[in-house]
């Protein structure tokens, strides 16, 4: 937070009581048309689950990226839970960078995907990536989006009639999500002929 405040004063950052309130705050900004990022550990996804899963049904207005830091081998956590299961359960796009450069480059891609599909995007990183650093090639930051609230309450209030309609929309988007995944520049296969 202090780094952001010192180096990017136009970006608003905040600490929240817990992961659920952080998810709700980010979702509220997204509903108002602003891009939002919410970060938490994998076990924090359990706390944020209600707001997270329902955000896939309401959809988003401004791009929303949920960054979850998983901890394979339990270096500093009580379990090895895999956040990708939450993304699959919520039926939203999941990105998984393997290097610091990929993590940096995927963020604008994640926002573009979120805004195009009107869905939150889950970005999963692991301990070795989250607790490391490297030089990266930087690019121009994304332009800020103005507040542009969508005041149609049926989009954001999940009463049963609205929820059924919104859920049907989410299900209809699954074919598009599959196509986007197959076309993604970050979804590639490497065949190392020299590996043993």
Where are these regions (language model features)?
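Thiamine diphosphate
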Residues: 1-100, 105-107, 126-129, 142, ...
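Flexible, low-complexity linker and terminal segments
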Residues: 97-196
């Amino acid at each position: 937070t202090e780094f952001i405040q010192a180096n990017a004063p136009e970006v608003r950052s905040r600490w929240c009581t817990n992961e659920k309130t952080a998810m709700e705050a980010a979702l509220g900004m997204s509903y108002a048309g602003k891009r939002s990022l919410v970060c938490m550990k994998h076990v924090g996804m359990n706390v944020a689950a209600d707001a997270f899963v329902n955000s896939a049904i309401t959809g988003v207005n401004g791009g929303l990226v949920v960054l979850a830091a998983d901890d394979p081998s339990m270096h500093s956590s009580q379990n090895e839970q895999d956040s990708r299961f939450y993304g699959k359960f919520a039926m939203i796009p999941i990105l998984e960078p393997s290097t610091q450069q990929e993590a940096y480059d995927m963020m604008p891609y994640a926002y573009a995907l979120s805004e195009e599909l009107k869905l939150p995007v889950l970005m999963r990183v692991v301990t070795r990536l989250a607790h490391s650093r490297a030089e990266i090639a930087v690019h121009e930051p994304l332009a800020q989006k103005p507040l542009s609230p969508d005041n149609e309450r049926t989009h954001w209030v999940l009463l049963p009639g609205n929820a059924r309609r919104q859920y049907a929309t989410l299900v209809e988007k699954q074919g598009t999500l599959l196509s986007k995944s197959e076309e993604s520049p970050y979804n590639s296969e490497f065949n190392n002929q020299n590996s043993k």
